[in-house]
From Swiss-Prot:
One of its GO terms (molecular function) is pituitary adenylate cyclase activating polypeptide activity. It comes from Pelophylax ridibundus (Marsh frog). Residues 1-22 form the signal peptide. InterPro entries: Glucagon_GIP_secretin_VIP (IPR000532), VIP/GHRH-like (IPR046963). Belongs to the glucagon family. Gene3D superfamilies: 6.10.250.590. Keywords: Amidation, Cleavage on pair of basic residues, Hormone, Secreted, Signal. This is Glucagon family neuropeptides. Residues 23-76, 168-171 form a propeptide. Residues 145-153 are annotated as: Important for receptor binding. PANTHER family: GLUCAGON-FAMILY NEUROPEPTIDE, PITUITARY ADENYLATE CYCLASE-ACTIVATING POLYPEPTIDE. It is found in: Secreted. It comes from the Eukaryota.
């Protein structure tokens, strides 16, 4: 029920909005005036600054934007912007081509194991990461075992070293 009411309300709102904006009064609103002449503080008439009958948004919006761009920026700046945009597009094209080439090479070498992953790392990097992780985990296990043995056997080990007259040291 709520969705139907919302749909009807949006439909009525859209129709009302379209009729208001397409009416002749709405299009000529900026040109309408209460008085024909405007006076300043001294009583002199001011020039008429009424808007055109065609508002800016009614014509071609792209041409209005181009006119504003050419009005605010000199030709040299526009040319420099164009050169920068062209160089940036070329750079992005090269980067995407390079990424595509790496992906093709990885597929050719068999590095991509499944189509669900979008990893395009080389196989050697993944392999070296795995070796490092494995070595580091072994090292951590060895350190944990040494620490455990030092805690369990620490008292007997210290006593044996002290009896021989040497310095105290753990494994």
């Amino acid at each position: 029920m709520y969705r139907k009411a919302l749909l009807v309300w949006l439909l009525v709102y859209g129709i009302m909005r379209c009729t208001v904006h397409s009416s002749p009064t709405a299009l000529k609103y900026p040109a309408l005036r209460l008085e024909d002449e405007v006076y300043d503080e001294d009583g002199n008439t001011l020039p008429d600054f009424a808007f055109d009958n065609n508002p800016i948004g009614i014509g071609n919006p792209a041409s209005v934007f181009d006119d504003m761009y050419s009005f605010y920026y000199p030709a040299e700046k526009r040319h420099a912007d164009d050169l920068l945009n062209k160089a940036y597009r070329n750079l992005l094209g090269q980067l995407s081509a390079r990424k595509y080439l790496h992906t093709l090479m990885a597929k050719h070498l068999g590095a991509v194991s499944s189509s669900l992953e979008d990893d395009s790392e080389p196989l050697s990097k993944r392999h070296s990461d795995g070796i490092f992780t494995d070595s580091y985990s072994r090292y951590r296990k060895q350190m944990a075992v040494k620490k455990y043995l030092a805690a369990v056997l620490g008292k007997r080990y210290k006593q044996r070293i002290k009896n021989k007259g040497r310095r105290v040291a753990y494994l």
